[in-house]
Design a protein with these regions (language model features):
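Membrane-interface alpha-helices at helix entry/exit sites of multi-pass transporters
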Residues: 126-140, 312-322
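Predominantly cytoplasmic-facing regulatory/coupling regions of multi-pass membrane proteins
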Residues: 1-98, 165-286, 318-319, 326-350
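Transmembrane alpha-helix termini and helix-breaking/packing motifs in multi-pass membrane transporters
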Residues: 150-160
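Transmembrane alpha-helix interface/packing and boundary motifs in multi-pass membrane proteins
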Residues: 102-108, 264, 279-295, 299
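Short intracellular "coupling" helices and adjacent cytoplasmic loop segments at the cytosolic face
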Residues: 98-116, 209-212
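Mid-bilayer segments of alpha-helical transmembrane spans in multi-pass integral membrane proteins
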Residues: 101-110, 139-147, 151
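Interfacial segments of multi-pass membrane proteins
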Residues: 121-129, 300-315
Length: 350
């Protein structure tokens, strides 16, 4: 990636991070950290582990495209096992994954910061078309797994909690929403999603003029990316299922973060309740995707979900605070990784 683009992503992230930090009540933060004790460090370390699941899902998508497509500057296709080595290393991709999520957390609209950064970093290694298709396919898989996670949560709620009429209506609404989301992405996997997403943007006020111009200028590239997405899904369905399972496992295991927080407040915690809290909170927060770091939405989601499970309001506030601090720390780590990648690129050039 060009130096000016790396600096741009880094400066943007730093500015947003500073703004987010200034919104914190530092006395409340200090009291929360004192109360959490070593569990806070367990939460930070947990996410170092969880990001490996995200990286692994993206990595196998890239490896799958490596086996089917020609290397940059080479007209011959790579046959599985014939290429000497994948040009993308796992731990390099881990840094890019963390940095991409850091930019996504800080960007209104979610995918507007991290995905362009990932494409720009990956392009020198595997080419623009394959970098774009692998990033889009991973982003689709990441979102697709959320719908399955919410469906799992609905099933767990039905099996473990009493249901009255208002709750039943809400669960039915979530079920319909998830079914529509899964259908939309399955169609996207078979026919490609890049062109469809740009067409949707072309009908949104504020973005439609840019989207229409982009479609006119890059229609051929969008068609190529969609063809590669469809080909990757059809040629290697095992890779697709593995990537979805890795992302779904990451969603479920990330409920341990809530369990660690609640163990500070109560002697025993039901892990299924933690899954339900995370599912409702993530659904609520994702509906507010246009807010950077989903400020207020995530905390409100924790407050409502804990209250819905007959926990105290203070439990929801405490969990929301610890999760917010963890996000800020990992945003900072992601920005540091951007600078590390920049220095590594300089060394490679020399």
């Amino acid at each position: 990636m060009k130096k000016k683009y790396q600096n741009g992503f880094f400066i943007f992230g730093i500015v947003v991070l500073i703004i987010m930090v200034t919104q914190l009540d530092f006395q409340q933060v200090w009291e929360g950290l004192q109360r959490a004790g070593y569990w806070f460090f367990a939460v930070i370390i947990l996410w170092a582990f969880l990001y490996m699941f995200n990286t692994a899902a993206w990595y196998i998508i890239i490896r799958s495209s490596e086996e089917k497509a020609p290397a940059p500057g080479n007209g011959t296709s790579n046959v599985a096992g014939s290429s000497p080595q994948c040009p993308v290393k796992f731990f390099w991709l881990y840094k890019i994954t963390v940095s991409g999520f850091a930019l996504n957390y800080a960007t209104p609209g979610g995918l507007m910061g991290g995905e362009p950064y990932r494409i720009m970093e990956l392009t020198p290694k595997i080419g623009t078309a394959r970098a774009s298709s692998s990033v889009i396919l991973y982003a689709m898989t990441h979102i697709f797994s959320h719908f399955w996670f919410w469906l799992v949560a609905v099933l767990l709620y039905v099996l473990t909690r009493p249901i009255n009429l208002p709750v039943g209506i809400m669960l039915c609404a979530v079920l319909v929403f998830c079914a529509l989301g899964i259908w939309f992405f399955i169609v996207g996997y078979h026919k490609g999603l890049a062109f469809r997403m740009m067409k949707i943007l072309s009908h949104i006020p504020g973005a439609k003029n840019w989207a229409k111009g982009f479609i006119d200028k890059h229609r051929e590239q969008l068609d190529t990316i969609d063809q590669q997405i469809a080909a990757l899904h059809k040629q290697n369905p095992r890779t697709f299922f593995m990537a979805v399972l890795l992302e779904l496992a990451c969603r479920i295991l990330s409920s341990a973060e809530i369990m660690f927080c609640l163990l500070v407040l109560m002697p025993s915690v039901n892990f299924i309740d933690c899954i339900l809290i995370l599912a409702f909170t993530s659904l609520f927060a994702n509906l507010l995707f246009f807010i950077p770091l989903q400020l207020g939405g995530r905390e409100g989601g924790f407050l409502m979900s804990t209250a819905g499970l007959q926990m105290t309001a203070s439990a929801g506030i405490f969990v929301g605070l610890i999760v917010r601090l963890r996000e800020l720390i990992w945003v900072a780590i992601g920005l540091v990784f951007i600078k590390i990648n920049k220095k590594s690129a300089k060394i490679a050039e020399n």
